[in-house]
Swiss-Prot record:
Residues 299-401 are annotated as: RNA-binding. Homotrimer. It is found in: Cytoplasm. Coiled coil: none annotated. Its main location: cytoplasm. The keyword RNA-binding applies. The modification Phosphoserine is found at residue 416. The gene is TY1A-DR5. GO terms for molecular function: RNA binding. Capsid protein (CA) is the structural component of the virus-like particle (VLP), forming the shell that encapsulates the retrotransposons dimeric RNA genome. The particles are assembled from trimer-clustered units and there are holes in the capsid shells that allow for the diffusion of macromolecules. CA also has nucleocapsid-like chaperone activity, promoting primer tRNA(i)-Met annealing to the multipartite primer-binding site (PBS), dimerization of Ty1 RNA and initiation of reverse transcription. InterPro entries: TYA. It comes from the Eukaryota. This is Transposon Ty1-DR5 Gag polyprotein.
């Protein structure tokens, strides 16, 4: 069949026929990204020159080993698909890589530049293909890349691998300054809580509620490096990463401790600005409270000098301590210790005056009863009975009647009442009664 085709074109040699077929095939099936047109022409000329030097070519002979020379075939037969050219239907490198990890919304699609290239924590696929999330927009972590060449796993399989708490999680903003790290880590902890990872966050005692898994540690490591670039990390964070670049849990634990310290600092400042003292508590306790607050603030970098501390203390004084505001307000070099010496002096004076007073306060009802008993005991009625009297059969009524009749009868004894009021009155009656004037 081949000899018949060649006999129809006697003026064309076998080599040139092969070259023409090859040129046609390369032109129609060439990959536009492979080689340029000038290179193809050079390859065609070299192939034509090599084939023209051959005298005879049998029909069943093998094709010369030329990577750009295809075997002579009819034009209708397509070229082989397993040739050396990269075909357009082949998968790209990004498509051949795994579509991502099977947890927490495919973290492989998150962009980051690792601090250290570790095979264990290196992301799958080239980093240049990862989409960049803007810091102001909460782009879901499971959002596929907008590039047309990337094809990831369908959403149904991704949903089954994600946690059931929230399908879309707003990522934290990008860290742009070391001074913003305390505020940024708060948003990052919130991001972990929304990603169903609240159990691995260290508590107040520095220990998490549950043990972190390897996949969760990988996710923690990758997301931390994505949104917190190394050039914007504080020095103490870099020191931790220099020892172990995967110890993100230690960074979170230290951050929580610093948050608590910041809260304590705020509470100390509020307490110092709202001090109140009127002597109701011991001066020693008040001094200890104030000095401890000032020492804590100074140790945490918030320096309170003597002038500011004295102003805050004197502003809260009241009662007898209030005059300290005016006696020493012009002394610029007054220290906190000197101010507390004055406070102690006033407190001790108050305690001394209180100790000099009687401790027991008399009840008004008791004072009334005591006054009655006092008159009865100091000025009692003097009644001297006659010891020789044997008959006491008269009633009290009769005796009282005799006393009244004897008082009404005029006698020399009654005149003695007007003469002297200090001497006892002696009534000459049978009862022999002696009464003082004050008892009437």
């Amino acid at each position: 069949m081949e000899s018949q085709q060649l006999s129809n074109y006697p003026h064309i040699s076998h080599g040139s026929a092969c070259a023409s077929v090859t040129s046609k095939e390369v032109h129609t099936n060439q990959d536009p990204l492979d080689v340029s047109a000038s290179k193809i022409q050079e390859y065609d000329k070299a192939s034509t020159k090599a084939n023209s030097q051959q005298t005879t070519t049998p029909a069943s002979s093998a094709v010369p080993e030329n990577p750009h020379h295809a075997s002579p075939q009819p034009a209708s037969v397509p070229p082989p698909q397993n040739g050396p050219y990269p075909q357009q239907c082949m998968m790209t490198q990004n498509q051949a890589n795994p579509s991502g990890w099977s947890f927490y919304g495919h973290p492989s699609m998150i962009p980051y530049t690792p601090y250290q290239m570790s095979p264990m924590y290196f992301p799958p696929g080239p980093q240049s293909q990862f989409p960049q999330y803007p810091s102001s927009v909460g782009t879901p972590l499971s959002t596929p890349s907008p590039e047309s060449g990337n094809t990831f796993t369908d959403s149904s399989s991704a949903d089954s691998d994600m946690t059931s708490t929230k399908k879309y999680v707003r990522p934290p903003p990008m860290l742009t300054s070391p001074n913003d790290f305390p505020n940024w880590v708060k948003t990052y902890i919130k991001f972990l809580q929304n990603s169903n990872l609240g159990g691995i966050i260290p508590t107040v005692n520095g220990k998490p509620v549950r043990q972190i898994t390897d996949d969760e540690l990988t996710f923690l490591y990758n997301t931390f490096q994505i949104f917190a670039p190394s050039q914007f990390l504080p020095t103490w964070v870099k020191d931790i990463l220099s020892v172990d670049y995967t110890d993100i849990m230690k960074i979170l634990s230290k951050s929580i401790e610093k948050m608590q310290s910041d809260t304590q600092e705020a509470n100390d400042i509020v307490t110092l600005a709202n001090l109140q003292y009127n002597g109701s508590t011991p001066a020693d306790a008040f001094e200890t409270k104030v000095t401890n607050i000032i020492d804590r603030l100074n140790n945490n970098g918030i320096h309170i000098n003597n002038k500011v501390a004295c102003q805050l203390i004197m502003r809260g004084l009241s009662g007898e301590y209030k005059f300290l505001r005016y006696t020493r307000h012009r002394h610029l070099n007054m220290t906190v210790a000197e101010l507390f010496l004055d406070i102690h002096a006033i407190y001790e004076e108050q305690q001394g005056s209180r100790n000099s007073k009687p401790n027991y306060r008399r009840n008004p009802s008791d004072e009334k009863n005591d006054s009655r008993s006092y008159t009865n005991t100091t000025k009692p009625k003097v009644i001297a009975r006659n010891p020789q009297k044997t008959n006491n059969s008269k009633s009290k009524t009769a005796r009282a009647h005799n006393v009244s009749t004897s008082n009404n009868s005029p006698s020399t004894d009654n005149d003695s009442i007007s003469k002297s009021t200090t001497e006892p009155i002696q009534l000459n009656n049978k009862h022999d009664l002696h009464l003082r004037p004050e008892t009437y």
